[in-house]
C-alpha cells in the first residue's frame, strides 16, 4: 500500500485514520472497529464489505 495514498484515506464511517494491516491485506479503523479489504491493491472502503474487529484484534 502506497504510504502517500494511506495518508489521504480515512474511514468512511468515522472519518478517522486507517492503518494498513499487511498480513491480512486490510485497512483497519480502530475507532469504527472495522477492517476494510484491499483487493488487488485497491482499497474497498464500503461499510458493507468491511468486517467487524473483535477485542483481541484491536489490542494488536
From Swiss-Prot:
Transmembrane spans: none
UniProt cross-references to InterPro entries, sorted A to Z: Trm112-like
Pfam families to which the protein is assigned, alphabetical: Trm112p
Cellular component, GO, one term: cytosol
HAMAP family in UniProt: UPF0434
Family (UniProt): Belongs to the UPF0434 family.
Name of the featured protein: UPF0434 protein Daci_3569
Species of origin: Delftia acidovorans (strain DSM 14801 / SPH-1)
